[in-house]
Amino acid sequence: EEGIGEYGIPNMYKNREPRFYQAITYSGKTWQKTTKQIYFYKGSGDDNSKADMSYSGYLLYKGMNRDLLNQGSNAKSKYRAGMLFRLADFYLLYAEALNHVNPSDERIIAHIDSVRYRAGIPLLKDIKPEIKGNQALQEEAIRKERRIELFAEGQRYFDVRRWMCADEEGYKQGGPVHGMNMNADNLEDFMERTAFETRIFERRMYLYPIPLNEI
């Protein structure tokens, strides 16, 4: 939905699933330690004139310490444990392996739904019962779940390469990367979808060697 809604929040950010709000800092979002809304258009105070601000109109929220506030005597930095492995990752990897061995295995949907249940969203067994046993549709569901659940955890780069789909529509790692119009000086114009960089991916890049220090 286009336009700016109540409280200065763009309508396109409303009624998203819970993981969106736990992962992304978007225009109109309020940092919980203050009542100040965050905006990224020119002159907003958080635009890209600052070296540490957004180039796309979004910032990462997932994994950020919600007790920090760069004002007054508040804590401005804190160490946090990094995520190497998560149970959700294992559930989805196992579901993917089962789907390649035996698509009719009931554990496939059950493991995907374990991740969705924790996220507080409807279960596939209830809203998409027709995909059960269909290898292609189950694979699609697993890939979508990995993209959302494991966002910003360093998995996507490797997922699209092991699936050999990094040059396919919907998974492309090359071409223009879009965000908001960071040159706009008001929220309405800022919400225009705008390319902010162009990346290159060619099929030969699937064959990049693994660095020795990674082995």
Language model features by range: what are they?
Residues 1-215:
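Acidic/polar-rich alpha-helix caps and helix-coil junctions
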